[in-house]
Amino acid sequence: MPIQNYRDLIVWQRAMDLLTECYRVARLLPPSETYALGAHLERAAVAVAAHIAGGHARERAEFLESLTGATASLREVETLLLAATRVCLLSGDQIQTGMQLADEVGRMLTALRRSLGAPHLQPGVSSHAAGAPSAGVSAGATAG
């Protein structure tokens, strides 16, 4: 099925799953963190999906820049989830799904950037993300 808009991108769909999970996790935080860590987590998760959607409407080079922005926001999400466990606000079990979704979205973003001809991988991309198979490009970038 050809991609007609950003909603057809599986990476955007999975980013929306991550967004939903981050909102769920934010509700587990104590009230004192609702407007600090919780709100920041929600904004970062929204930014991942928003960068993908907004970039899809642009030219290739701008789309690549937007995917880089999505990756940066994704790293924020991961850091905020890990920070919540570091300061004992959440358990590892409570952030596990979010971390798994973040890993999946990260691999898909890397594969999509490669398929669009990104000149190099963004610094900080994990080694398993760098080894994403080329078959994952079409599976990760398009709706099936």
Question: Which residues does each PLM region occupy?
Answer:
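Amphipathic alpha-helical assembly/interaction segments
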Residues: 1-144
